[in-house]
Amino acid sequence: MADIGIDQKDPYFVAVKVFLEDGGKLFIFKDKFGAWDLPGGRIKKHEFQTPLHDIVKRKMSEEVGDVLQYTVETMPSVLMRHERVESVPGNPTVHIFGLGYRATRAGGEVVLSDAHTEMKWVDVNEFKPEEYFTGGWLDGVREYLKLIKK
């Protein structure tokens, strides 16, 4: 087999995403750039050795506050690949590999961060994700909805 150089590899960021449910409803929110999203985000360089559940807790705390109580499954339910244009000088396109974790709200309320402008709890049986999501995140939400409706 031929040796494939590093220039043939596709570098990915890695993100954790949380499918937060409460009584048949899924939590989604809109970021300050107008894109709908799930709680979560990219793993930071210094977190390479950090357990994924600790990263999930950090991202949930940053994005939905510390008042919300929830339980998270130990293994990802959905794997996603997403491409996005960054809102930084040069607007580079980046690839993100996402691990989607199922979570259940146990109490408390969502307190949105300053990075988010709107939130919704959508009925999983009536939700049309294509009206909110695009690309790999849309594929991941569709996969998740199929999984929970089995």
Please name every model-derived segment:
Residues 24-66:
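Conserved Nudix-box catalytic region and its N-terminal flanking loop in Nudix hydrolases
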Residues 20, 100-104, 121-123:
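Short, well-ordered beta-strand micro-motif
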Residues 13, 33, 38, 92-98:
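Short connector loops at helix/strand junctions that flank enzyme active sites
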Residues 1-19, 23, 90-91:
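Acidic, metal-coordinating catalytic segment for phosphate/diphosphate chemistry
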Residues 34-36, 111-150:
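Nudix hydrolase/Nudix homology domain
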